[in-house]
Amino acid sequence: MSRKLIKYLPLLVLASSVLSGCSNNVSSIKIDRFNNISAVNGPGEEDTWASAQKQGVGTANNYVSKVWFTLANGAISEVYYPTIDTADVKEIKFIVTDGKSFVSDETKDTISKVEKFTDKSLGYKLVNTDKKGRYRITKEIFTDVKRNSLIMKAKFEALEGSIHDYKLYLAYDPHIKNQGSYNEGYVIKANNNEMLMAKRDNVYTALSSNIGWKGYSIGYYKVNDIMTDLDENKQMTKHYDSARGNIIEGAEIDLKKNSQFEIVLSFGNSEDEAVKASIETLSENYDSLKSAYIDEWEKYCNSLNNFNGKANSLYYNSMMILKASEDKTNKGAYIASLSIPWGDGQGDDNTGGYHLVWSRDLYHVANAFIAAGDVDSANRSLDYLAKVVKDNGMIPQNTWISGKPYWTGIQLDEQADPIILSYRLRRYDLYDSLVKPLADFIIKMGPKTGQERWEEIGGYSPATMAAEVAGLTCAAYIAEQNKDYESAQKYQEKADNWQKLIDNLTYTEHGPLENGQYYIRIAGLPDPNADFTISIANGGGVYDQKEIVDPSFLELVRLGVKSPDDPKILNTLRVVDSTIKVDTPKGPSWYRYNHDGYGEPSKTELYHGAGKGRLWPLLTGERGMYEIAAGKDATPYLKAMENFANEGGIISEQVWEDTGLPTDSASPLNWAHAEYVVLFPSNIEHKVLDMPDIVYKRYVAK
């Protein structure tokens, strides 16, 4: 497509590469900017994020390439740069037409299959076959280990007719710096390579192809973007080269030139950085780029414990997902998930999703690293937590990777978890900066918590009290190692006192379920037998506190605070199983609690603040850990978690009752993957590997 050039800018790039010494450096780039036809009728309609049902997630296993990608519905979904909490892309997908009679969107109109390059890498092959049997698109997706570039090699095949019967288009939806609105798009030619650029503030993206574009257009979402144009006209009729608003960048692939091609999306903090990365990545040998990406991940996996050869693909995939969830600037900041729950119904007002740091989730991730033998990663997470302790001695409910609070609830288990982790890692050097401030805060605020671990309601929670007792016991030991004997005595006395109060504060003997005796989810008053109503979040309703049960009470056993054969534990197990357990075709799982509203109302409705909570696979793992503590076999629960994983080896936050398949909740949920990683060797060794032994010895083995 011929275009008039109205701006010519020769650009000299002084830096030779992101990594010194890499090949195919570009020292001088000539940039011509097109600025002929701006899109009209902006700024475009409001957009959403992508589905949270991820088929894969990935990044280079190093601190140099700061790009993370996700896959959903057979296409690239959210991509993050330069930090793991900053999404810049909603989606990159293909659209197929015959130019006259049909339009086929690969994310809606194909059957998508995902394969890993190897069991020990986070590189993916997607095979999308048209539901009507007309075409197939095969894609390989990974990142450049030396640059801030996402690479996709694609192949289009005609299953009906010939390639010349089809037109292939690419749609790129930028959501730069967690915002879909008011992004700027424009077109340049750099060293004779046409690139679709997008920018917001100091973040730039450059989309390019090794065979160029047959045509392109930048339009406003649902006004005149490429998808709207194709729906109306079956081929590209709009040819805009700039727009500012809620934009979609579109391009036509010249199938006559080649049906197999490479697409590169590069990032930078300036236009020249993004353009340079794109040119350098395209100039590299594709197979070499792919091999380098695979080699980094395989080297990591081969460094992990393999448990005498028993380690399986889900174990390795879980460890890679956890490893990939660390920010590369703020080291040790492991987010909860590379997803936005129910993202296809969430807009710009949901900037955080689950790509934030929770102290609780990070604790479980660190325990997985310890179990797998990656103690360095666990230590980095603890060092990070020490940096986010606030002046009042507490860690926020969750934070951006910078440590800036996102939500502001106070959860005392999130204060205790880093103390337990410090004990497990023997990090007595963090006493003044982490352990003591958190322990003092727990004593000041507890045992009543502002929110329990489901982040919804305050009161006296058996799970939170288990964490408080375990945390203070560990804090007492660490205080002794630092010769702070006065604090050590204070912490241990408080732990002993609260351990004795757990039953009085959280165990009802007059409940309406089963025989009436069990640990309740949470007591709003310091009397679990009181007639006191609590409000269930997310539209769950209002109920007497004695009506609600939760598997979280098993933390009493997991953390060594109660014996697994304590009659009160056994009583509650029976009540929980009869009330909130479901046997799915893939294995058993549990609701967080009865009347939970955090989930889709139905399979045809997204969650928008009220619904029905579904089953949580991580609770299956927690039950397995209890069975091990009780001297039993956890294999059925381990297998259930394996069955809950999707084709890409990803475990979601929630699954459907009738199928055991993922809902549109967060996926992957790192907490669930961490649970699987710890359960796997615990079942082999017949021992709860993340139980703090000092707590167990004091309260159970005495």
From Swiss-Prot:
A lipid is attached at C22 (S-diacylglycerol cysteine). Residues 1-21 form the signal peptide. One of its GO terms (molecular function) is glucan 1,4-alpha-glucosidase activity. GO terms for biological process: polysaccharide catabolic process. Substrate binds at W342. Keywords: Carbohydrate metabolism, Cell membrane, Glycosidase, Hydrolase, Lipoprotein, Membrane, Palmitate, Polysaccharide degradation, Signal. It holds the Pfam family Glucodextran_N. GO terms for cellular component: plasma membrane. It is found in: Cell membrane. The keyword Translocase does not apply. CGA has typical kinetic properties for a glucoamylase, but this bacterial enzyme had higher isomaltose-hydrolyzing activity than other eukaryotic glucoamylases. This is Glucoamylase. It comes from Clostridium sp. (strain G0005).
